[in-house]
């Protein structure tokens, strides 16, 4: 119960009308300024102007409250007011000087109140007031000097009041006045009103609502309009009063009178003020008039069409004031041009057909506009004979732009055509050079250039020059090794290594060669000449690799037979082909542990001739891994014996073919009598290393564990897993397709760059900008083939001695990797 009582008491306190504190909606700006304070329709309504509003407010709206009076004490603190809305209150009294503190006030709305008069004191201090709205009040008297303190008034709304008479001097001091609304007042059309009517005739009222000004008294003039658009109409008050009050003399009516217009910003009045905002902005000059040229400016219509007009403006003194030609369009106006000469011919174009236009000559002085004379005309309707306005300028611009674009397209097309033609010529020349070089590599350097070019032009014909292969040497199977005397005799005869390049080796000078297949040359017809070249070289290298492997295994087998005596029993069905080893093999002699280790067959000693040495892996011609270089795991340490085989160079005794001497380099085991191949016997079974056991001699890969110019993967053979039959099967030639012959080291699908087998030739692909954006080639794979072919061709073509064998050694490793 106690809680319910407390809640009820609190609710009564909140809902009590007397305790409610009125508030206003404020729109604030920077630095604490209040731009707008809306205190209208407050509940409860204000009876006095509230004092809690910030004094910096610019726009104060107190309409629809219950204000009774306007006092100086309640307004003096609002010094920044520019707009004050007191519409629909109960104001009946305004203190004299109540607006003295509002020197910046421009709009004052006092409509729908209970004011009975307007005096000079009530409007004192508002020198910047432009709009005064006192409509729908009870005003009966407006003193003649009521607006003397407001010289900037533009619009006055006194409609719907109780005015019966006005003095002629009431609005005479308002030079900027443009709108004076007096409709809805009960005018008494007597002679005391004639002075005001005389001013009203001269005044150029923008609204032109003359029909709304009517007389209510005396009775005989009730309903007569004060003024009408035709002033000499018989039924109007001014005509009657002119005959009655001036003895028949009509007051002089000037044809034109300067009507000032202020450029100050017009403010939209409140919607409840009883004043239509469109009527304020309705600026329509009077009808056209003619004046004396010596008295003031004059404007005449010279020529008019349905889209243009020509005006003649005459100004007697053009430099006395600043004259401007202004166009009025209902409620809007715009400046056309400044008039600086006494007589100017103004041509107006881009007009609409059958449209009324109004142009006025206006002078500007002290930021105020004065209309001197105006001209209104209507453009005529277009006829079939009239021509539309010319659009030559626009057409000229459009055609110029299109011409420039078309010219740019032509120039770019010509440049593109020239560059493409030049590029095609370069490609053609490069293709011819490649074919020429390939023919040189096939037929040798001693062939004359004319024959090569002639052969290159015949793309589909087979070669007519004989091409010899490398001489084949009979197999070593079944033959015995030469005696020790033969070996010693061979040591006494040194061999001089013959020098030759790859072309000479391929042609096989002095040897029995096989004819080259005739279907090799037509491979040049396709677009991948370099790929065919690499494939051809790879095939030849495979054959060389097979020969080298056969020779190495034959040497190991014969050495094992020599050391094992008659107890060494090999498989008689095994056949080895060695086309590069002599027919009579040399015998070996046992040497000490200090024997000089030399490289294996076709493995030259490494020279630091390259600035960028590559890490050499284990050689493919080594028969065992690094672990088998010492002692086999199948034998014991005690029975392990180290043998060395001396291979002397004795070409006369062995009967080497003349053509095979090109394969022997001066660094090979056949050249030096002191070269020894260390052989490691591996025990078998229980490790009894007697003479009756089978000894497998293995070449120690001492040299191949060092660095070399070329890096290639090695062959690994596990001694325990690989049998002799497996090794023999490895020596069988492998058949691979032409596509697989291009090794991964040179495959353009993995490396889009050139290839060079040594650092002497750069491996970077020098693509030009045009090559990257060639529209007629979607892929640069052919360029990669060309780069690889050129690099390898140069290296092989100009290689001598050790360099040649280095290349063969490299390709041997590559071939071995592919076989794995």
Curated annotation (Swiss-Prot):
One of its GO terms (molecular function) is protein phosphatase inhibitor activity. It is a single-pass membrane protein. Pfam families: Fn3_ELFN, LRR_8. Residues 23-397 are extracellular. Residues 292-379 form the Fibronectin type-III domain. It is found in: Membrane. Residues 1-22 form the signal peptide. Interacts with PPP1CA. This is Protein phosphatase 1 regulatory subunit 29. It comes from Homo sapiens.
């Amino acid at each position: 119960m106690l809680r319910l009582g407390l809640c009820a008491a609190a609710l009564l306190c909140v809902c009590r009308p007397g305790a409610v504190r009125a508030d206003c909606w404020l729109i604030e700006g920077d630095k604490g300024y209040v731009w707008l304070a809306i205190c209208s329709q407050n509940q409860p309504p204000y009876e006095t102007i509230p004092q809690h509003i910030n004094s910096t407010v610019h726009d104060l709206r107190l309409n629809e409250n219950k204000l009774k009076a306007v006092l100086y004490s309640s307004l003096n603190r609002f010094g920044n007011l520019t707009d004050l809305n007191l519409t629909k209150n109960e104001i009946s009294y305004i203190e004299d000087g109540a607006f003295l503190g509002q020197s910046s006030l421009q709009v004052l709305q006092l409509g729908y109140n209970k004011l009975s008069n307007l005096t000079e004191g009530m409007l004192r201090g508002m020198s910047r007031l432009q709009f005064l709205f006192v409509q729908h009040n009870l005003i009966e008297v407006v003193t003649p000097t009521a607006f003397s303190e407001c010289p900037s008034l533009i619009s006055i709304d006194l409609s719907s009041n109780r005015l019966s008479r006005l003095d002629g001097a009431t609005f005479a001091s308002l030079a900027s006045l443009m709108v004076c609304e007096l409709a809805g007042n009960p005018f008494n059309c007597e002679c005391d009103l004639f002075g005001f009517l005389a001013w009203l005739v001269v005044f150029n009222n923008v609204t032109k609502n003359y029909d709304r000004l009517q007389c209510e008294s005396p009775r005989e003039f009730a309903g007569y309009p004060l003024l009408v658009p035709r002033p000499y109409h018989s039924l109007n008050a001014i005509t009657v009063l002119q005959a009655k009050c001036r003895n028949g003399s009509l007051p002089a009516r000037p044809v034109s009178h300067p009507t000032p217009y202020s450029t100050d910003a017009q403010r939209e009045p409140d919607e409840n003020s009883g004043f239509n905002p469109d009527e304020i902005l309705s600026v329509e000059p009077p009808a056209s008039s003619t004046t004396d040229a010596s008295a003031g400016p004059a404007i005449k219509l010279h020529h008019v069409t349905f889209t243009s007009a020509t005006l003649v403006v005459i100004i007697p003194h053009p430099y006395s004031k600043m004259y401007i030609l202004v166009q009025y369009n209902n409620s809007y106006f715009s400046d056309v041009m400044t008039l600086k000469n006494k007589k100017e011919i103004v041509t107006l174009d881009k007009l609409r057909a059958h449209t009324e236009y109004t142009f006025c000559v206006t002078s500007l002085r002290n930021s105020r506009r004065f209309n001197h004379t105006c001209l209104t005309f209507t453009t005529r309707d277009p006829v079939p004979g009239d021509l539309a306005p010319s659009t030559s300028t626009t057409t000229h611009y459009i055609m110029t732009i299109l011409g420039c674009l078309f010219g740019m397209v032509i120039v770019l097309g010509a440049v593109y055509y020239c560059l493409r033609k030049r590029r095609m010529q370069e490609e053609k020349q490069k293709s011819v050079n490649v074919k020429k070089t390939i023919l040189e590599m096939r037929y040798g350097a001693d062939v004359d250039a004319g024959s090569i070019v002639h052969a290159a032009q015949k793309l589909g014909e087979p070669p007519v020059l004989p091409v010899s292969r490398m001489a084949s040497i009979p197999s070593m199977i079944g033959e015995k090794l030469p005696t020790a005397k033969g070996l010693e005799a061979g040591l006494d005869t040194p061999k001089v290594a013959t020098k030759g390049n790859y072309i000479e080796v391929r042609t096989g000078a002095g040897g029995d060669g096989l004819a080259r297949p005739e279907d090799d040359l037509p491979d040049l017809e396709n677009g991948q000449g370099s790929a065919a070249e690499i494939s051809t070289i790879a095939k030849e290298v495979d054959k060389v690799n097979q020969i080298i492997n056969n020779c190495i295994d034959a040497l190991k087998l014969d050495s094992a037979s020599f050391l094992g005596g008659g107890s060494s029993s090999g498989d008689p069905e095994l056949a080895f082909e060695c086309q590069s080893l002599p027919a009579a093999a040399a015998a070996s002699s046992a040497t000490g542990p200090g024997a000089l280790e030399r490289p294996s067959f076709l493995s030259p000693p490494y020279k630091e001739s390259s600035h960028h040495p590559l890490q050499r892996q284990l050689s493919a011609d080594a028969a065992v891994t690094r672990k088998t270089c010492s002692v086999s795991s199948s034998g014991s340490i005690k029975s392990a014996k180290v043998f060395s085989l001396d291979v002397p160079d004795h070409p006369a005794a062995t009967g080497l073919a003349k053509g095979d001497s090109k394969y022997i380099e001066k660094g090979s085991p056949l050249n030096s009598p002191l070269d020894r191949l260390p052989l490691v016997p591996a025990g078998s079974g229980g490790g009894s290393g007697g003479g009756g056991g089978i000894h497998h001699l293995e070449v120690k890969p001492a040299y191949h564990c060092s660095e070399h110019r070329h890096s290639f993967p090695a062959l690994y053979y596990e001694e325990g897993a690989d049998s002799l039959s497996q090794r023999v099967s490895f020596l069988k030639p492998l058949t691979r397709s032409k596509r697989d012959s291009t090794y991964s080291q040179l495959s353009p699908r993995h490396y889009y760059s050139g290839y060079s087998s040594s650092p002497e030739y750069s491996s970077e692909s020098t693509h030009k900008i045009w090559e990257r954006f060639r529209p007629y080639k979607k892929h640069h794979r052919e360029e990669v083939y060309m780069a690889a072919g050129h690099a390898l061709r140069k290296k092989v073509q100009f290689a001598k001695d050790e360099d040649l064998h280095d290349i063969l050694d490299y390709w041997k490793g590559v071939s071995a990797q592919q076989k794995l």
